[in-house]
């Protein structure tokens, strides 16, 4: 092939490559290769970042606050507002179409609000059953209530399998095996009030070794109140208040101002870092009496500081801590370790002069030093042995020969 023909083929291939690149750039479904060039319009406005849009969508920040912090281009703010309006209008149109479809559909009774009402009716007459044995199954409960209510005089209060609209029993895997066991409670729903009342009367009945506790499913009595921090506190009431989840920028003065209306504050003990001196995230506030710490736990205005929810509870009062006394070791041997006999115990001459008698400790009751194998140490056993001579032994003229 000649050089002219080769140059023509190269020109054709270049044109084909350029056309393919243009098509790839225009096609939104295909990914752009690293070789492809990107054209950037420097005059166009800078759009908001994903983080900024997310904060605006959740309502945590306003456009004015973002503009004051980042100095956003006004064109990008207008574009964001237009996009938000378009999304709202599109959502409203979809809702309107959805309402029309539910009205026009022939099976509209089974959709929308009608289905919700049916579910509410099904879950209206329910009971909560607690203190169940972990081996109890749904069939055990159904058989138990059917057998207990079949002899009731009122037919409406008799329970059958068809009358139980829903039975929810949460289950988890056992620790030592793969078998599934219930969590100790379940919910059971019936068709009418009479059946629910008949089952409620069976509370404290015996099933699988446990006395069942049956309550109305909407009766939440007995649960700890999350807002009652006094009852939720692990420690007994004291004048010390523990405050956790503090910001690192919190100071003693800020804490004192925040809790000063609760009572007289004696001192504030805040854990701080050695290098920066900032708060580690928790502190102890010592009030003059228990009323101050109790008021702080009850006051809802004290539960937030610097925009952070606080974790508060009673602290441990060390002044009320009971110190355990150490029990003195009593020797097993009842015999005295002192010899106070008239002959060996003490010097009578010293006693006659008015001075204190001198006691001599006897070594008879002492235990010999013993090693880990309960054997007397070699240094002690050979202490009284005669020391061998290290001199040269003279020859006796005897020579042993081996054949």
UniProtKB/Swiss-Prot annotation:
Biased segments, Polar residues type: 99-108, 330-344, 371-381
Chain spans, region Disordered: 1-43, 72-116, 313-403
Modified residues (N-acetylserine): 2
Residues covered by the RRM domain: 125-219, 239-317
Residues that bear Phosphothreonine: 105
CDD domains listed in its UniProt record: RRM1_Nop13p_fungi (cd12396), RRM2_Nop13p_fungi (cd12397)
Pfam families on file: RRM_1
GO MF annotation list: ribosomal small subunit binding; RNA binding; RNA strand annealing activity; RNA strand-exchange activity
SUPFAM superfamilies the record matches: RNA-binding domain, RBD
Signal peptide range: none
InterPro entries: Nop13/Rnp24_RRM1, Nop13/Rnp24_RRM2, Nucleotide-bd_a/b_plait_sf, RBD_domain_sf, RRM_dom
Localization of this protein: Nucleus, Nucleolus
Basic and acidic residues: compositionally biased ranges: 1-35, 75-97, 313-329, 345-361
GO cellular component, one term: nucleolus
Residue list for modification Phosphoserine: 2, 335
Additional note from the record: Present with 3830 molecules/cell in log phase SD medium.
Protein name (Swiss-Prot/TrEMBL): Nucleolar protein 13
């Amino acid at each position: 092939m000649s050089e002219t023909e080769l140059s023509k083929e190269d020109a054709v291939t270049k044109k084909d490559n350029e056309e393919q690149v243009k098509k790839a750039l225009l096609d939104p479904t295909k990914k752009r290769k690293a070789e492809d060039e990107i054209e950037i319009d420097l005059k166009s406005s800078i759009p908001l970042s994903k983080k900024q849009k997310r904060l605006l969508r959740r309502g945590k920040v306003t456009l004015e606050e973002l503009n004051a912090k980042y100095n956003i281009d006004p064109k990008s703010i207008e574009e964001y507002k237009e996009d938000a309006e378009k999304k709202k209008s599109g959502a409203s149109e979809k809702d309107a179409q959805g309402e029309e479809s539910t009205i026009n559909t022939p099976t509209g009774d089974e959709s929308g609000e009608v289905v919700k009402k049916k579910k509410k009716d099904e879950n209206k007459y329910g009971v909560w059953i607690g203190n169940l044995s972990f081996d109890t199954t749904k069939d055990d409960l159904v058989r138990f209530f059917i057998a207990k209510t079949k002899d009731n005089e009122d037919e409406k209060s008799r329970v059958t399998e068809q009358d139980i609209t829903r039975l929810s029993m949460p289950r988890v895997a056992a620790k030592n095996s793969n078998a599934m066991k219930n969590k100790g409670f379940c919910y059971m729903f019936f068709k009418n009030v009479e059946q629910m009342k008949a089952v409620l009367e069976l509370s404290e009945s015996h099933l699988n070794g446990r006395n069942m506790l049956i309550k109305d499913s909407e009766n939440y009595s007995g649960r700890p109140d999350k807002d009652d921090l006094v009852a939720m506190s692990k420690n007994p009431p004291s004048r010390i208040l523990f405050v956790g989840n503090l910001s690192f920028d919190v100071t003693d003065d800020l804490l004192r101002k925040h809790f000063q209306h609760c009572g007289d504050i004696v001192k504030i003990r805040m854990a701080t870092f050695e290098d920066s001196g900032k708060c580690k995230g928790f502190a102890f506030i010592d009030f003059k009496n228990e009323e101050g710490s109790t008021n702080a736990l009850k006051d809802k205005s004290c539960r937030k500081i610097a925009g952070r929810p606080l974790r508060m509870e009673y602290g441990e009062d060390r002044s009320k801590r009971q110190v355990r006394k150490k029990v003195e070791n009593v020797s097993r041997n009842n015999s005295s370790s002192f010899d106070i006999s008239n002959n060996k115990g003490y010097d009578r001459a010293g006693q006659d002069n008015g001075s204190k008698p001198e006691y001599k400790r006897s070594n008879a009751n002492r235990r010999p030093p013993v090693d880990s194998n309960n054997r007397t140490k070699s240094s002690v056993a050979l202490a009284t042995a005669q020391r061998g001579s290290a001199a040269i032994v003279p020859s006796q003229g005897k020579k042993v020969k081996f054949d």
